């Protein structure tokens, strides 16, 4: 470990990670006794605590105040571990104490807001650790038990079901771990914080500020049945949701995680710490899910603790009624656990800033130790406009949307939960308005307008003249009820969806959306009706970022002699097939690095095939579908400057003087392009110039971008109207990477600029980013009249076959009904066919000859959803029936309770 000296031009001292490395260095000193490790740690602490260090700014790390809390916690640990080292001076200790007290005073004021958040808890932890290392018990008690302190956070932040109110796996683990670490620190001063039970706040919001125009909700939904909150509740709440490998599905701002995953490099907040404090067998079980290289060397037992449990948590379905996380698990008898199916659903409290607008969505699907989808598959970091303008929006999830808009956060209604033998089922209702997402996401950094934000990130998109205010939603619909009933059988998942407007005259487009990876086949019954560069060219919509869209339609083709069921004859489902590969650095990326196009981890190596069926549920004579390319993250964003320059014929005698014919600049990424059309009268030489700067991945990160810049199909138009491809001429490249040649991107794929393919594109990425890249073309003898081209960035880069695809069925009207079936398998599919079998019924024919009829009843019963009636305690009429036949004989039947 080495760290740079403070750069006084920055508004922070160090990268936050250096404080954690200082703590680790101090641990090594304790283990080895070698003074050099103490000296190294002390050197860092001296710079941090000097008068011109933290107290000058005050900002210790390069991130947010929450991370300064982590910084101070690690710095306090480091100081404590080398406290008795004989190299300290009196001035050193004075500076450290003054710095810690300065921070504590700062945080004392910060936590009096009355809110609960992971930020405040981390900031409190830094203050408690600072007070502890100074031996100041009074300050420890203030931050543990005082107003806004850790006990207050426990009362306000923990939901009745034990989840942290932000309902995100990482923040659940973070808060459970921080509370537990505070307990360890408090125990050294005779305080028993680990067993504290506090009275809940019982409030229905976790924010005292006014409602935000961007749609963020801090409201808490669901029941309050407990009269206490405890640290153990945080640890206990997640255990039922972990699978047999110790991996949990993501929800809101989280992907799949193991119990030891949260900020693993910095601090170990996992079930080994929980077991040290509470010795519960459930925690010992969680430790058994960890590999040897995943053990906690700070808090773990030398030998894995033994445990006895009557039932293993991963064997049954479960849900959390406040957080709204659901996991349904198949349990076919005598089937290996890795072959069972898990499906995750989301329906509960929004989760504040980390909440996604995806109530009634399928937010996870796992089989064979592999994940098909999670809420963060497409992820841009917090400090980008895409975070709120796309990542959290409804169309980025597996759900039904209205007009491709964003669902408003509103309290859901649970319709049913059933855990049986033949099936598992869950039903939920959402009743809310839909709108455009907050325009431009939300303001981050110092940029005051979306134009400024676009430029600093290097990500352009069209900005209309009369757009909404920055970060404000617009274009609201009336309330629309959406209902989803998910049924999990031994072999597949069924999603029944019903949506209906609250206004009888309102007409909407309803989309039943899935995002799956590696599309290999589209049903032969479909034919392409058209292709559009974007799913929508509406500049207010997040659908503009989904590109390369094929629109399909199918006509009913029925046998004349076939018998109609509810007016629908022989309606066979439309099928889409997918193939996904998993390897060490393929669909396992983010455990190594977050900067990857598909944020998923802990997947077993191998392949997973998935069949997706859409069952016709209406009498319409056609079904409409779309297949498009969602905006998977890639390091393609850059600030692009371009010029078309010329040397004129008239300047031959006086020397070659360049004239700028056209120029521009924009952010080139998934979108962003400019069309060039310039006159060439009197031009002797043409110069195409490009200069780039890497765009920011938010305010905190800047990485070298991929090579993407091309001149799209440049053409010389002659005076007699002939169009000559520039790629056919000899041109000279200076400081320009020619890549794979004309018409190929820098990884050998096709060149697409804003979803338009250019088969004669000329590479233009500068080799040295500090200089302009120049392409020179001699026009003498060409009788040139005009130059035409497109300039922009290629996306996606390289092979596209494994990319995630957005697939949806669309219906138009006042209401919509969908039925979709998903079977993940390893190449030996059980489903032979799926078809319509009557109102809200489907028939699934299996490879062994069995036929299963899956039906949902009461899904269209809107009386119990009538807002004019008191239906809070009304029992839902929704129920599910599965019937199984062999050779026409009923062999099994199961129905959920009415």
Which residues are covered by each model-predicted region?
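Aromatic-lined, polymer-binding surfaces characteristic
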Residues: 9-231
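Low-complexity, Ser/Thr/Pro/Gly-enriched N-terminal "stalk/linker" regions
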Residues: 1-6
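Gly-Asp-aromatic-enriched flexible segments
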Residues: 535-539, 652-797, 801
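A residue-level signal for conserved active-site and pocket-lining positions in enzyme catalytic cores
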Residues: 75, 714, 820
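A short, structured loop/turn motif at beta-sheet edges
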Residues: 33-35, 417-424, 488-491, 680-684, ...
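Extended polysaccharide-engagement surfaces of secreted carbohydrate-active enzymes
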Residues: 167, 171-656, 798-898
